[in-house]
A protein has these predicted regions:
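Bacterial Sec-dependent N-terminal signal peptides
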Residues: 1-24
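Carbohydrate-interacting regions of secretory-pathway proteins
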Residues: 19-196
């Protein structure tokens, strides 16, 4: 499936996009021909900016081939979005989170001054350290949920602990959403439906 998404947003604090000795963030000639796009080149934050902004001011940086936040984000700051708008997509990313960390990947967010945070307009794939978060979590707040909306079967997904790499994927196909964590389906729903 070709990537075509409406702005993604990420919340700090968070480490995103895996890097090891394998060359990541590259496309094969076939993937290029099929229309796939990279959202991160492994070296720069080109293609990203602050939510409702024209440039990227932080707290994000590239460290050893990964996008990382400095941990200074808050509920009202630290959100970055893609420069390009998309519609339907298949997005896969590797990530790890710091001990006690809380973050998320939001999509189809609306950028307008009256919406200073992305979670009031777009669904959030929750990324959080369930074990070490400072406050007790409700099921709708746990890692892998469609935040405050749809819950996975927590018995069928495995989230690696803080500091270890996980892989997540979201497929958005004409309003039908399927999410995955480490190869296991977490949630499936229809966006903008009466239930949603």
């Amino acid at each position: 499936m070709k990537i075509t998404i409406v702005s993604f947003a990420m919340a700090a604090p968070f480490g995103l996009i895996a890097c090891d000795n394998t060359k990541h963030n590259t496309l094969t000639e076939q993937e290029k021909a099929e229309g796939w796009e990279l959202l991160f080149d492994g070296e720069t934050l080109d293609g990203w900016r602050d939510l409702n902004g024209t440039a990227l001011t932080g707290p994000w940086e590239v460290v050893n081939g990964t996008i990382q936040a400095d941990g200074q984000g808050s509920d009202a700051s630290g959100y970055i979005v893609t420069d390009k708008a998309y519609e339907n997509f298949e997005l896969s990313w590797d990530w790890k989170i710091s001990k006690g960390g809380n973050s998320g990947l939001l999509y189809h967010v609306v950028e307008r001054p009256q919406f200073p945070v992305p979670y009031v307009t777009g669904p959030e794939y929750q990324l959080i350290d369930d074990i070490n978060f400072a406050e007790p979590l409700e099921d709708w707040q746990r890692c892998g949920v469609d935040y405050a909306m749809y819950l996975p079967d927590f018995n069928t997904i495995k989230v690696h602990p803080a500091g270890e790499w996980n892989n997540s994927k979201i497929i958005f196909d004409n309003g039908h959403v399927t999410s995955f964590m480490n190869g296991h389906k977490t949630v499936e729903f229809d966006a903008w439906s009466d239930d949603w």
